[in-house]
Amino acid sequence: MSRIGKQPIPVPEKVAVELDGLSLTVKGPKGELSRTLPEGVSISQVDNSIVVSAINSKRKSRERHGLSRSLVANMVEGVSKGYSKKLEIVGVGSRAQVKGKNLIVSAGYSHPVEVIPPDGITFVVENNTNVTVSGIDKELVGNEAAKIRAIRPPEPYKGKGIKYAGERIIRKAGKSGKK
């Protein structure tokens, strides 16, 4: 039995949960998320909590037990609190701005790069170098932040590029000149 999977998921008062077999819909103050859980698990609602359990003790079922519990917990937290990832743009002339809903990043290329957000994702830019990606779906927020970082990943010599807030870039020494 999964140590993560056997923990019940507390459901806040503001969050409504609808179960239909392996389909789950979670509604909260920030929005609504739906997901179909993988085969091999069962889900039930007990009082103000959700319990995910493995149907049998086969390997596939045990593997998906903890995964399913984490997915449901992320959905409940997403519709009640939301998720956000912060990115920092480092480098001379590198900056970002929001135009409508789209994010426009100038990262040292000959042209600005435009990032179009999927539904449920918002971009906020503070003082041209700090970008916050926020939404209710943890997976979607992480993927969008990774796409923005991939525009210009931080390089190890000067540390220029787009990095996550708090990310430590391991620096390399440059060439040691001829002596």
Swiss-Prot record:
Xref: InterPro entries = Ribosomal_uL6-like (IPR000702), Ribosomal_uL6-like_a/b-dom_sf (IPR036789), Ribosomal_uL6_a/b-dom (IPR020040), Ribosomal_uL6_bac-type (IPR019906), Ribosomal_uL6_CS (IPR002358)
Quote the Pfam families the UniProt record gives: Ribosomal_L6
What PROSITE patterns does the record point to?
Answer: RIBOSOMAL_L6_1
Signal peptide (UniProt feature, chain positions): none
Q: Keywords assigned by UniProt?
A: Ribonucleoprotein, Ribosomal protein, RNA-binding, rRNA-binding
Domain of life of the native organism? Bacteria
- Keyword Membrane present in the record's keywords: the answer is no
Would I find Signal among this entry's keywords?
no
Annotated GO MF terms = rRNA binding; structural constituent of ribosome
Instruction: Tell me the GO BP annotations in alphabetical order.
Output: cytoplasmic translation
One GO CC term on file: cytosolic large ribosomal subunit
Q: Matching NCBIfam families, A to Z?
A: L6_bact
Q: What does this protein do?
A: This protein binds to the 23S rRNA, and is important in its secondary structure. It is located near the subunit interface in the base of the L7/L12 stalk, and near the tRNA binding site of the peptidyltransferase center.
Quaternary organization: Part of the 50S ribosomal subunit.
- Homology family: Belongs to the universal ribosomal protein uL6 family.
Q: What is this protein called?
A: Large ribosomal subunit protein uL6
Q: Which organism is it from?
A: Prochlorococcus marinus (strain MIT 9211)
Q: What gene is this protein a product of?
A: rplF
